[in-house]
Swiss-Prot record:
It comes from Mus musculus. It is a single-pass type I membrane protein. The lineage of its organism: Eukaryota, Metazoa, Chordata, Craniata, Vertebrata. Zn(2+) binds at C188, H355, H359, H365. Its cofactor is Zn(2+). This is Disintegrin and metalloproteinase domain-containing protein 25. The active site is at E356. Residues 660-676 form the EGF-like domain. Expressed specifically in testis. Residues 419-505 form the Disintegrin domain. The gene is Adam25.
Length: 760
């Protein structure tokens, strides 16, 4: 292969440039058209015409439920019985496999470039593994009904797909053809000579010499991917571009599964299909790589920004499977590769493409000293069935990652990865609502699939929308969450709650702290959050000793590849140091707890190293005090005067507080903007409160309470009265002594006798 770029020798190259300028941008009239087309594919296996070595087994995937922690993290478990035993698969949805701004480029018969932005379901691709076998692989999709995809167990690959016309969720499991899944004579086209030439060519390119980044601790990285599918591969799918897309999505899901061990996430930004003719000639694989890279640099890069771009070709290259530039990721002129796709074994294709992308990421072919638990790994020169990276591949990757700036970017799930599409579940400009999929819209009482409100509906979403109607003014739509926050109320006209406002930065809060960005900042409280309720901020000697070291355990920030030592005035603004720690806390992955004995004090802290994507819990928070009238801002101890504001309790007539927009938030009984007149309180930013309604409600509740209390007392008195009557009746009915009878004429004599007797 030539070491310098040469002009294209392919026909119509000049026409391509002119044609690329005439892009026809279109939108699909009905967004669910793509879904209906793709659903047709459920009758055809995703692996195309792949051969199988045995008759299929019928299985019924059964969902397994229970109290396992992994389910709380989005993992699902299913049991499948095949191969004479029961298997449990753990799967998790792969979010953002396809960009929300995903574009498909095709060509008209006249040669005009046609752009579509179809709705693509993005939560139905799953990756995972078999229970008890961390080396296994599961890559399936549920987008088209049931499970369709690949299961790899102990080096054996199975295809799973739904059984047609089954009413009991039956699936078919096939064992893939062994001649495609075991060691083959096919190999990567990268030879030692070509590798040397590529290195020489790249070393001469100054764009490859990016900033050195010693000490980088690698974690999550993101790669924007663009793909091109040449004419013959589209013909293989009977010119059905929807089938091509399904194949592409499934392959990317498999590759993402392979690269998960490196914590690399691929996001597909776009696909270009050469459905009319190829725009470069397909001859030898070396020439194709050169010409594709040149075409990409002058054409594709302007349509689909990418970190890596590959072309899928349905063409024989002898024994060669693919070719890619080494260490070329992030370099627009060389970050490309060629992949040969013949037949329909998508797992086989996934290994090929993952191998060639490995070259883009700096990985060379494995030598005899490289290992991945077996002697043959993914980056072996000849293809094999083991999609695992070796220790050598890891080393090459780390070296490339240290200089590959495009990989060290924040995830683009927000922002440019989202296009304006009705039906994607996100309300864009010009849409009254967006209920998402057809099923979701069928269940939505307020929104139509056309992203307009249903008859009688005034709203479909928002904190001030209830049962498709706007809530009345004065309804609380956002309660305060802490002492540094302020409430908001609906205004009666909008379905949206007013913007969140909170106390002005610098407002005092508990334990001598200050409010800053809606939180009360205090080092003692920060230590409690990390190490438990008994912990507290350590002695100043801990801060002085550790934060002046300038390492990952004590520093005042990072510039490029170096930790900054804290100067003495700023030691309280570096990393928080704690004491009185009773137990080591449970922290997220990649977190480190350290302790140091210093002059009879044990100083506790956490580290935060390069490449971590989780929040840093151990850095002293901005707004924390660092001395009299001083606070920490950007790891510097600065005067509290930076919070000087025209708003103060005095400007609020001492009847309110200042919010973060420097406006008065008045107490109950005073009216904004300056709390000078009687009113309901609140601010010009919070919406109108309805304290009267709240007072009436409280009064009503109080009245109800008094009524209840009255009836309770009445019942008690009634019981006491009944008891009193019972005892009174018992007393009246007690037996009493007989009284002397009054003598009558008939018994007069007898009476006298008795009386005489008694007197005697």
């Amino acid at each position: 292969m030539q070491t310098t770029q040469r002009a294209s020798s392919f026909a119509a190259a000049e026409d391509n440039i002119a044609m690329d300028k005439a892009v026809v941008y279109t939108r699909i009239p009905h967004l669910y058209l793509w879904l209906e087309i793709l659903n047709i594919l459920s009758s055809r296996p995703l692996t195309g015409y792949a051969q199988h070595t045995s008759l299929p087994e019928v299985v019924i995937p059964l969902r397994v439920t229970g109290n396992r922690p992994m389910w709380a993290m989005g993992w699902l478990t299913y049991s499948l019985h095949f191969g004479g035993q029961k298997h449990f698969i753990h799967i998790k949805a792969k979010k953002f496999l396809v960009s929300r701004l995903f574009s498909v480029f095709t060509y008209t018969k006249q040669g005009a470039l046609h752009k579509d932005q179809p709705y693509v379901q993005n939560d139905c691709y799953y990756h995972g593994h078999m229970d008890g076998d961390p080396e296994s692989m599961v890559a399936i999709t549920t987008c088209y009904g049931g499970f369709q995809g690949i299961l790899q167990i102990n080096g054996t690959v199975y295809e799973i797909k739904p059984k047609n016309l089954s009413s009991t969720f039956e699936h078919l499991v096939h064992k893939m053809d062994s001649e495609e899944t075991e060691l083959l004579p096919m190999r990567c086209a990268l030879t030692e000579e070509i590798a040397r030439q590529m290195k020489l060519q790249q070393n001469e390119n100054p764009t490859l010499m990016q900033s050195h980044y010693e000490g980088w601790w690698t974690h999550k990285s993101f790669l924007d991917l663009a793909l091109v599918v040449e004419r013959e591969r589209i013909r293989y799918h009977n010119n059905n571009t929807s089938r091509v897309l399904v194949e592409v999505f499934t392959i990317i899901n498999i590759i993402n599964n392979i690269y998960e061990t490196l914590d690399v996430e691929l996001v597909l930004l776009g696909v270009e299909m050469w459905n009319e003719r190829n725009h470069v000639q397909v001859r030898s694989i070396e020439e194709l790589l050169d010409e594709f890279c040149m075409w990409k640099a002058r054409s594709l890069n302007f349509r689909i920004p990418n970190d890596i771009a590959h072309i899928f070709v349905n063409h024989e290259f002898g024994i060669y499977l693919g070719l890619a530039y080494i260490g070329s990721v992030c370099v627009p002129s060389h970050n490309c590769g060629v992949d040969r796709l013949l037949g329909g074994n998508l797992f086989y294709f996934g290994r090929i493409i993952a191998h060639e992308m490995g070259h883009n990421l700096g990985m060379e072919h494995d030598s005899s000293s490289c290992t991945c638990g077996t002697k043959i790994c993914l980056m072996a020169p000849a293809d094999n069935g083991i999609p695992k990276f070796s220790n050598c591949s890891y080393s090459y990757y780390w070296a490339t990652y240290a200089t590959a700036k495009c990989m060290r970017k924040e995830k683009k799930s927000k922002g440019i990865l989202r296009g304006k599409l009705c039906g994607d579940g996100v309300v864009d400009d010009g849409e009254q609502c967006d209920c998402g999929s057809a099923k979701s819209c069928a269940d939505d009482p307020c929104c139509k699939p056309s992203c307009t409100l249903k008859d009688g509906a005034a709203c479909a979403f928002g904190l001030c929308c209830l049962y498709c109607q706007i809530m009345p003014a004065g309804t609380v739509c956002r309660q305060e969450v802490n002492e540094c926050d302020l409430p908001e109320w609906c205004n009666g006209h909008s379905h949206k709650c007013p913007n969140d406002v909170y106390l002005l930065d610098g407002s005092p809060c508990r334990d001598g702290g200050y409010c800053y960005e809606k939180r009360c900042n205090n080092r003692d409280e920060q230590c409690k959050q990390i190490f438990g309720k008994e912990a507290r901020s350590a002695d100043h000697s801990c801060y002085r000793e550790l934060n002046t070291q300038g390492d990952r355990f004590g520093n005042c920030g990072v510039i490029r590849d170096a930790y900054l030592r804290c100067h003495d005035p700023d030691i309280l603004c570096g990393r928080v140091q704690c004491e009185n720690v009773a137990h080591i806390p449970f922290l997220r992955d990649h977190s480190t707890v350290h302790w140091t004995h210093l002059n009879g004090v044990t100083c506790w802290g956490t580290d935060y190293h390069f490449g971590m994507t989780i929040p840093d819990i151990g850095i002293v928070k901005d707004g924390t005090d660092c001395g009299p009238e001083h606070v920490c801002i950007n790891k510097k101890c600065v005067s509290k005067s930076i919070w000087r504001s025209q708003c103060s309790p005095k400007t609020c007539n001492m009847k309110g507080v200042c919010n973060n927009l420097h406006h008065c938030h008045c107490n109950l009984g005073w009216d904004p903007p300056h709390c000078l007149k009687s009113g309901l309180g609140g601010s010009i930013d919070s919406g109108p409160p309805n304290y009267t309604e709240n007072y009436t409600e409280k009064k009503h509740k109080k009245s109800i309470g008094l009524v209840i209390l009255f009836w309770i007392l009445f019942a008690c008195f009634s019981v006491l009265f009944i008891v009193f009557l019972f005892f009174l009746r018992s007393y009246v009915e007690l037996p009493m002594s007989e009284e002397p009878k009054v003598p009558t004429p008939e018994n007069k004599e007898d009476t006298n006798e008795v009386m005489n007797t008694e007197t005697e």
